[in-house]
């Protein structure tokens, strides 16, 4: 299907909520450049509102961990096959896979082999583990768009076309956090000491982390009954899952809130959270945090042998040093969580030093990420 240069057909594939946000920003920036552009592929509500015609619901791609992926593998393979067939029929001017690399990069390889221009937006953690993937990536895409500067350096070293675009969240989130405004918006006590607890957005993630987080909350409550807890539930299913666990501790002073995770973090003094994109939001909000990561035993046995990076949380990777405690797998004990959380509450001077470092990183990541990504895609379209 041949398109006019000023009205390209752009395919985008997102598999998670964070990718949906990035995709919507890219679509809006591309539409500013090409008012007649059309968008097809797979996305969520944000991308739909930006004008995407989605082949199937993005939620079908949201699975976690190796064993979890295996249980969904037949359906994922079927979806991938139908998506490849659809895109080969449509022949878009460019195909942009957004994150979810185990799903999107094999699609890019097939489409690239058939002459379509392909872009991957959000680098997989190839610099941290399974570095051999770089060879396959190089054969699958015309361009990598990275959110973080150290990722771009890695691709340059391996002769993969790359553009560092920064992170859209760094543009959206102010350098100074309005704690009082966030607390007012959530009807929280202005003077309370608040711990935000973010156990993740996926069922498997919450199932792995929330019991450990809850045990720590109970222990903290015994030590300091004045401490308050706020948990944002990513969706109705996560709310029900979390509420079931909270029902076992009816006397805990906890507020369970629908969504608004960024506002919840902004309102908090300290954040206890799952590893992932939300840790970057925590950094941009200047929040002291404790980061937990736990997956199934089989997944961890495989992953632990392949990890090359010293850190797994984005704040530590971006700062190139251990700024926040990371509790991995068996390290995620009640005692360790309590000690790490208490350290932030008891040592405000360390929290202030953290804020200075985080604001420096925030500045590096600012500067119109969606527009930079659109400019890089436009250069490829017009090449």
Swiss-Prot record:
GO terms for molecular function: lipid-A-disaccharide synthase activity; phospholipid binding. It is an enzyme of class 2 (transferase). This is Lipid-A-disaccharide synthase. GO terms for cellular component: membrane. It comes from Alcanivorax borkumensis (strain ATCC 700651 / DSM 11573 / NCIMB 13689 / SK2). Signal peptide: none annotated. InterPro entries: Glyco_trans_19. Transmembrane segments: none annotated. Belongs to the LpxB family. Its EC number is 2.4.1.182. Pathway: Bacterial outer membrane biogenesis; LPS lipid A biosynthesis. Condensation of UDP-2,3-diacylglucosamine and 2,3-diacylglucosamine-1-phosphate to form lipid A disaccharide, a precursor of lipid A, a phosphorylated glycolipid that anchors the lipopolysaccharide to the outer membrane of the cell. It catalyses: a lipid X + a UDP-2-N,3-O-bis[(3R)-3-hydroxyacyl]-alpha-D-glucosamine = a lipid A disaccharide + UDP + H(+). One of its GO terms (biological process) is lipid A biosynthetic process. Keywords: Glycosyltransferase, Lipid A biosynthesis, Lipid biosynthesis, Lipid metabolism, Transferase. It comes from the Bacteria. Pfam families: LpxB (PF02684).
